[in-house]
Amino acid sequence: MTASSSELDARWLAALARLVDRAAHELKGALNGVSVNQEVIRSRAEKPNTSAASVSSFAAAAADQLDVVISLTEALLALTRRAREPVDVGAEVRRIAILLGAAARSDEKRLTIDDATAWSSVGATSAPGSAVRLAICECLLVAVERSTEVRCVALADERAPGMRIESGEGNAVMVEPEIVAAAADAGITIRAEPSAVLISFPR
């Protein structure tokens, strides 16, 4: 039995909920940092003989934390919208990695992905957006849960563009069979290797 569009959407939204839950601490921390630094600036600025230079470092810190908030929120907003088809694989990887990478850092883990040039060579896939996002998100979630070092590598192929998610410690990246089956129904292949998982998308 193949997965319907509504079933794929439901699976993707469940994965997105897990992703957002992982990133929530980082987002709340950045928002709190902006608020605290603004309050410090206000408090110091009210004191007589305070120079602008004495509060500039707090303004810079608030700006850095606001950048984090904007980056996470923009990624989340894009992932809640229907993906444009054909689906840009690299764009979806980057959005998911922004949220999961923030969560990984708070757990003292590291997620790295290839640069934009590498992903541009992968290109787009005809697979449904929900299926593409589901496959990428589930594989990355499992990898980050089981490893402290995870690398996401772009694989360019004329017939089947894809990606390889590698565990730095050599841990197996085993995705739930129902996720593998749902992805396969959409033409996406998820294949586990001893210390990595490969995802291939239909052109």
List PLM regions with ranges.
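Conserved catalytic submotifs in the C-terminal HATPase_c
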Residues: 110-123
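Conserved ATP-binding N-box helix of the HATPase_c
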Residues: 17-29, 35-36, 126-151, 176-185
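Short beta-strand/loop element within the Bergerat-fold HATPase_c
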Residues: 147-166
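Flexible, glycine-/charge-rich segments associated with ATP-binding catalytic modules
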Residues: 1-4, 149, 159, 172-203
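Hydrophobic coiled-coil of the DHp/HisKA dimerization-phosphotransfer domain
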Residues: 82, 86-87, 120-129
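Histidine phosphotransfer helical core of two-component systems
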Residues: 2-8, 12-19, 27-67, 123, ...
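Conserved DHp (HisKA) dimerization/phosphotransfer helix of two-component histidine kinases, i.e.
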Residues: 37, 54-110
